[in-house]
UniProtKB/Swiss-Prot annotation:
Top-level EC class: ligase
Annotated CDD domains: Anticodon_Ia_Leu_BEm (cd07958), LeuRS_core (cd00812)
Pfam families: Anticodon_1, tRNA-synt_1, tRNA-synt_1_2, tRNA-synt_1g
Binding site residues for ATP: K584
UniProt cross-references to HAMAP family, sorted A to Z: Leu_tRNA_synth_B
Motif 'HIGH' region per UniProt: ranges: 42-52
Source lineage: Bacteria, Bacillati, Bacillota, Clostridia, Thermoanaerobacterales
Name of protein: Leucine--tRNA ligase
GO terms assigned for molecular function: aminoacyl-tRNA deacylase activity; ATP binding; leucine-tRNA ligase activity
One GO process term, biological-process aspect: leucyl-tRNA aminoacylation
Keywords: Aminoacyl-tRNA synthetase, ATP-binding, Cytoplasm, Ligase, Nucleotide-binding, Protein biosynthesis
Gene3D superfamilies per UniProt: 3.10.20.590, HUPs (3.40.50.620), Isoleucyl-tRNA Synthetase, Domain 1 (1.10.730.10)
Length: 826
């Protein structure tokens, strides 16, 4: 018997076998039900980290389990390969981004194969391959033709370090999410996707996703930010123009004492009077250079400047001063905000700073507020005051009443507004999919025809960030002919945001080599939606929102039949060490390659699955890894020690088993039930593994403490086989090797999942407690189906009980079936 599991040679042998036999190749069509299991594909940074290992191990358990349950499982892998790190590596090391990326892909593919993940590698894709980004460009054109892609001048987030623009979602705490540099605001011509056209559907359809974590849905709901209110016009005094504001609180309209407009608003230059112009221009220039977070953060000082203009409150007829304010953003609402200092804290602070009136228009029940003495704004409910025609009305009733009143006079309209902004997709960098647009002096903006795709990235470029796209440095790329008139034209030199590529890759996996379209319609109909999607919660807003948007547009185009891409979503926790996320700067990184070399793939997988539930953060523990390694060695020794004994043992009906043999079989079937439910209904892989460990303990007890003459080899054979089948998704190498060593020629990964016998789950005997006057005095085993009267008699016949009640009067005996018998004496 081999005492030790030598994983290195066994893993290498089995990897070759699995690849040769195509164990993980899944057909596109069959009579079996489908299941699409997908982990978010990685950026090819060069090496797997432990977060990757956990993500892919979780997905692999699900994929293997569903395969064993009779499904055709689509479980692919690819590479989110465009992006700034490759370009920065080119700048730093003088290596072309393409070569850096493909070298990294080769390294990470090898590491994933070492991990033993059940990917169908025939479906591998990389978003930087022309065969992929050709269809990214094709999809851009479809959006363009539907009016969903447009170019506009707009204030954008600019990262001076990366020398490119960032989407709102890519700005975190006022800095670039990638390099943390403080973000600036600039006004540039950029390409956008009109995601706001789908805001309502994106919001409402969250209700169709019961398989998503509630926190992710709440994050998306808040980002979309639906508000119901009114757009109200404040005429500008002495002009034919009006300032329009959106508000959810028309009930506070009588309390407006000033108006604020964004520094970027075109009205600023038109309404500012000559004597205020120089100061206002200096103020707006200063405010526009700040990031959005700097301008809106609670701790940042709110500043404003009087423009010299006044507007008229349409409800009261009162003129109020117009300020330009740094906290008002052009891209939110109308770019104008009415100031109601008595009932909004930010407005209150602004009014106190600039000596503006504070007028109370909502009085709470049982209190009397005075604007001159208030220390903070009142934002609660109450009744209106100082609002002619609406005084004494409850403020909740006044909201629609005032809106209707103004609407009848042409001064307001009911409106729904969203916090969500259109998706900025253009980037001034090289390593991305070129935007398939050309500019012709005669024809204007011209989309590249489909037969002209892909628009290939040139190689004769310099990568140093200058604020202009590196593609501008390639004359052969820039200079082209107009597809419409044949005259000279210039190509668009911005590239697409990498989220463009990752917003549709799950469709491409269904037919990754399709050349007549982005996917085959029959195949995408067969596999979509993704049944289980797995990835980090950090993608809740960007990738997941964009993917949902893409899917809805593609549904409207008739290219797919689903409106939501991911039925179920699991957001796994982080891998921590010493209580912190692993990072080089903290010096707490654990290399997966080191762990794989030292302990093997099965131990590595088992630990990240056993150490914590998947949605919780996992604390790295060297002792925990050692424990998983020892467990697998125990399984190895146990199975090898009984292999000869159980080989050829004929099955025995459960009805013929008694005593220890029946108990061993019962434990086996109880474990099957536990592991099945933990994987299928809860993804509690840690408790599933724990149940397998308990089964191994029981098997050792059965082997070592039951005399061979009393031990039925068929019972041990069943326990061994079921144990290996249960371990196959978690420890695929060990399970497959031991399966072969116990006489099975086929791979265990072609075997069905074991079923349990419900009748065997019921215990023959149960332990009951004997209480005398409420105190536990004895315990004994009785038949599980014993009648209450028989329980009573059995307990009273016990010598220990008889001794304890001797000389006392038994007042009553209360049997509780399956639990206890309580005897009351005096």
């Amino acid at each position: 018997m081999e005492e030790k599991y030598v994983f290195a040679e066994i893993e290498e042998k089995l990897r070759r076998r699995w690849e040769t036999e195509g164990i993980y190749h899944v057909p596109d069509f069959s009579n079996r039900p489908k299941y699409y299991c997908l982990e978010m594909f990685p950026y090819p940074s060069g090496n797997l980290h432990m977060g990757h290992v956990r993500n892919y191990a979780i997905g692999d358990v699900v994929a293997r389990f569903k395969t064993m349950r009779g499904y055709d499982v689509l479980h692919p892998m690819g590479w989110d390969a465009f992006g700034l790190p490759a370009e920065n590596a080119a700048i730093q090391h003088g290596v072309p981004p393409a070569r850096w990326t493909w070298d990294n892909i080769n390294v990470m593919r090898t590491q994933l194969k070492l991990l033993g993940v059940s990917y169908d590698w025939r479906r591998e894709l990389a978003t930087c391959h022309p065969g992929y980004y050709r269809w990214t460009q094709w999809l851009f054109l479809q959006f363009y033709h539907r009016g969903l892609a447009y170019k506009a001048k707009a204030p954008v987030n600019w990262c001076p370090s990366c020398a490119t623009v960032l989407a709102n979602e890519q700005v975190v705490a006022g800095g670039c999410e990638r390099c943390k540099t403080a973000v600036e605001r600039r006004e540039l011509e950029q390409w956008f996707f009109r995601i706001t056209a789908y805001a309502d559907r994106l919001l409402k359809d969250l209700a169709k996703l019961p398989g998503w974590p509630e926190k992710v849905k709440v994050m998306q709901e808040n980002w979309i930010g639906r508000s119901t209110g009114a757009e109200i016009a404040f005429p500008l005094a002495g002009t034919d123009e009006a300032i329009r504001v959106f508000t959810t609180r028309p009930d506070t309209l009588g309390g407006v004492t000033y108006m604020t407009i964004a520094p970027e608003h075109p009205l600023v230059s038109r309404v500012t009077t000559p004597e205020h112009r120089a100061a206002v221009e200096a103020f707006t220039e200063r405010a526009r250079s700040l990031s959005e977070l700097d301008r809106t953060a609670g701790e940042h000082e709110k500043e404003g400047l009087f423009t010299g203009a006044y507007c008229v409150n349409p409800l009261t007829g009162e003129q109020v001063p117009v300020f330009v304010a740094n906290y008002v953003l052009m891209e939110y609402g109308t770019g104008c905000v009415m100031g109601v200092p008595a009932h909004d804290q930010r407005d209150f602070e602004f009014a106190r700073k600039y000596g503006l009136p504070v007028r109370v228009v909502i009085q709470p029940e049982g209190d009397l507020l005075d604007g001159d003495t208030m220390s903070q704004a009142y934002t609660g409910p109450g009744r209106l005051v100082n609002t002619p025609g609406f005084d004494r009305m409850a403020n909740a009733e006044a909201i629609p009443a005032i809106t209707r009143y103004l609407e009848a006079r042409g001064a307001a309209r009911f409106q729904v507004q969203y916090r969500l902004r259109d998706w900025l997709i253009s980037r001034q960098r090289y390593w991305g999919a070129p935007i398939p647009i050309v500019y012709c002096e005669g024809c204007g903006v011209v989309p590249v025809p489909e037969e002209g795709l892909p628009v290939l990235l040139p190689e004769d470029v310099a990568f140093k960030p200058t604020g202009r796209s590196p593609l501008t440095e390639s004359p052969d790329f820039v200079n082209t002919t107009c597809p419409t008139c044949g005259g000279p034209a210039r190509r668009e030199t911005d590239t697409m945001d990498t989220f463009m590529c990752s917003s549709w890759y799950y469709f491409r996996f269904t037919s990754p080599r399709e050349e007549n379209g982005p996917w085959g319609l029959e195949r995408v109909d067969r596999w979509l939606p993704v049944d289980q999607y797995i990835g980090g919660v950090e993608h809740a807003i960007l990738h997941l929102m964009y993917s949902r948007f893409f899917t809805k547009v593609l549904y409207d185009m008739g290219l797919v039949k689903v409106q939501e891409p991911f039925t179920n979503l699991l957001t796994q926790g982080m891998v921590l060490k010493d209580g912190a996320k692993m990072s080089k700067s903290k010096g707490n990184v654990v290399s997966p390659e080191d762990i794989l070399n030292r302990y093997g793939a099965d131990t590595t997988r088992l630990f990240v699955l056993f150490a914590a539930p998947p949605e919780r953060d996992l604390e790295w523990s060297d002792q925990g890894v050692e424990g998983c390694y020892r467990f697998l060695q125990r399984v190895w020794r146990l199975v090898n020690s009984v292999a000869d004994e159980i080989r050829g043992a004929a099955p025995v009906p459960s009805a013929n088993l008694v005593g220890v043999n029946r108990s061993m079989r019962r434990l086996t079937h109880q474990t099957i039930k536990k592991v099945t439910e933990d994987i299928e209904t809860r993804f509690n892989f840690n408790t599933a593994i724990s149940a397998a460990m308990e089964l191994v303990n029981g098997m050792y007890h059965f082997r070592d403490r039951v005399a061979p003459v009393n031990r039925d080899p068929a019972v041990m054979r069943e326990a061994v086989e079921r144990l290996l089948l249960l371990l196959a998704p978690f420890a695929p190498f060990l399970a497959d090797e031991l399966w072969a060593r116990t006489g099975h020629p086929e791979s265990i990964h072609r075997e069905p999942w074991p079923e349990y016998d419900p009748e065997l789950l019921v215990e023959d005997q149960v332990e009951i407690v004997v209480q005398i006057n409420g105190r536990v005095r004895d315990r004994l085993m009785v038949a599980a189906d014993i009648a209450p009267e028989a329980m009573r008699d059995t307990v009273l016949e016990q010598p220990r009980v008889q001794a304890l009640v001797a000389g006392k009067e038994i007042v009553k005996v209360v049997p509780v079936p399956g639990k206890l018998v309580n005897i009351v004496v005096r």
